[in-house]
């Protein structure tokens, strides 16, 4: 399995070599500014680009399969790409500019995190996600929802592995479409003036980050952003959430 630091440097190199106007965002930015390193408990590496400058196809071309990256299936309305390689994931987020603000859209299952039924929805989401995407078993059973949830995953993972091998790409797309017939669009939103960028040196390479990263992080994580929270749940605790309800159109 590739190390997170190596994947980060490799991804930055790909973006820099192709002159992509990107910036580091979300949990990856938090680790760089607060911890002076990538967060060891973070599941992915977060980059952002402007939606009006690049299409998903533009980014997929530079993270092509011959570089070892595989795209996870996702909803058309999601303004992001999830690129998996050797058990790790790189997320490319496409931010939309709208007057004096900018926002990103992700599709999530509707429901209350405090509801006793919500974990059943999460389990359902896990099953669909595992079946339609090339998620490794180790990554799949890793859970942020406690030991009981992890145990349930371990009990059902073997039949899911067998079933996944039998499914065609067409069936996988139909599965994903039907499972997300109604969903909620949620993401982060920022004042546009906070998304101005500068170059810094990190891990011996040049990277692009917001000019005022502390303000961006405070806007996202709150006044206590400097206090580590390994079990942070963005959909519950994010301070700058953007919400929109839509129905599915297409699968990519």
Regions found by a protein language model. Name each.
Residues 31, 48-50, 208:
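General alpha-helical segment detector with a strong preference for membrane-spanning helices
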Residues 48, 53-73:
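Active-site surface patch of divalent metal-dependent phosphodiester/phosphate bond hydrolases
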Residues 30, 55, 98-100:
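Surface-exposed, flexible loop/turn segments at secondary-structure boundaries
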Residues 23, 41, 224-225, 234:
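Tryptophan-centered motif/residue detector
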Residues 1-12, 16, 64-114, 121-130, ...:
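Conserved catalytic core of two-metal-ion nucleotidyltransferases
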Residues 12-45:
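Active-site nucleotide-donor binding segment shared across nucleotidyl transfer reactions
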Residues 36-57, 204:
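Catalytic metal-binding acidic patch
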């Amino acid at each position: 399995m590739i190390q997170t630091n190596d994947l980060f440097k490799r991804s930055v190199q790909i973006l820099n070599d192709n002159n992509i106007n990107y910036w580091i965002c979300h949990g990856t930015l938090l680790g760089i500014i607060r911890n002076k390193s990538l967060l060891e408990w973070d599941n992915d590496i977060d980059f952002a680009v402007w939606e009006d400058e690049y299409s998903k196809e533009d980014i997929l071309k530079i993270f092509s399969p011959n570089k070892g990256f595989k795209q996870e299936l996702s909803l058309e309305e999601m303004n992001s790409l999830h690129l998996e390689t050797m058990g790790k994931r790189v997320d490319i987020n496409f931010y939309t500019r709208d007057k004096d603000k900018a926002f990103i859209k992700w599709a999530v299952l509707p429901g209350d995190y405090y509801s006793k039924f919500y974990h059943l929805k999460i389990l359902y989401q896990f099953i669909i996600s595992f079946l339609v995407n090339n998620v490794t078993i180790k990554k799949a059973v890793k859970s942020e929802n406690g030991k009981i949830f992890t145990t349930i995953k371990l009990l059902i993972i073997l039949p899911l592995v067998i079933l996944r091998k039998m499914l065609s790409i067409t069936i996988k797309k139909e599965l994903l479409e039907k499972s997300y017939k109604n969903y909620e669009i949620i993401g982060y939103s920022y004042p546009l003036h906070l998304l101005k960028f500068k170059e810094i040196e990190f891990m011996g390479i040049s990277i692009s980050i917001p000019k005022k990263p502390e303000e961006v992080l405070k806007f996202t994580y709150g006044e206590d952003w400097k206090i580590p929270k390994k079990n942070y749940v963005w959909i519950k605790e994010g301070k700058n959430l953007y919400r929109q309800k839509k129905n599915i159109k297409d699968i990519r």
